[in-house]
Amino acid sequence: GIIIGVVTLTGMGLKFSSFIVSISGNNLLVALVLTMASSLVLGMGLPTAAAYILVATLTAPALVSMGVDLMAAHMFVFYSAMLSSITPPVALAAFAAAAICREPPMRVAMISVKFGFVAFLLPYFFVLEPRLLGMGGIGETVGVFAMAVVGVLSLACVLQGYAFGKLTTLSRIVIGIGALAVLMPDLKFKLIGIAAILAVLVAW
């Protein structure tokens, strides 16, 4: 309540949103990158509820004003804020994990970012493909979700350089492009992406 009151009475939320829109030059991709960066910083060291309230009042309005669906905008900033738990320099989850595995916290944080890199891409696809959030018919949602699983698993294989065996550089590039295409909203891109991934697997 205090946070919302301060943001509302001072006009901070409107100013912050206007700042993001003006800096981005009304370019949605740039606005998304700036919003994610802001959400990562604002979410550092905060519990889930507090982080969401803060980013929902400061950063989400900028995306909504640029035509992004309300649910997608809020999920984008919420998801981004939660990723701050593994993002250096704060990375509270990494500090907890470091105490368990007895490793330097920053090393654990960097490895966490490497393993969880796909998670930093997912919020963008919430905006590009709102059906990932269940905004559509059951058939559409199931189909899009299945495609998302294929895309995320493929990206994870690319980042690790391993699928059913060690991947070559060319295989990683082809699978990576295919995985990104699968996550796109256009059906043609999805089909091209699946074809690219299958081509690599068949040629294995």
Feature names for model-found ranges:
Residues 1-204:
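Alpha-helical transmembrane segments of multi-pass membrane transport proteins
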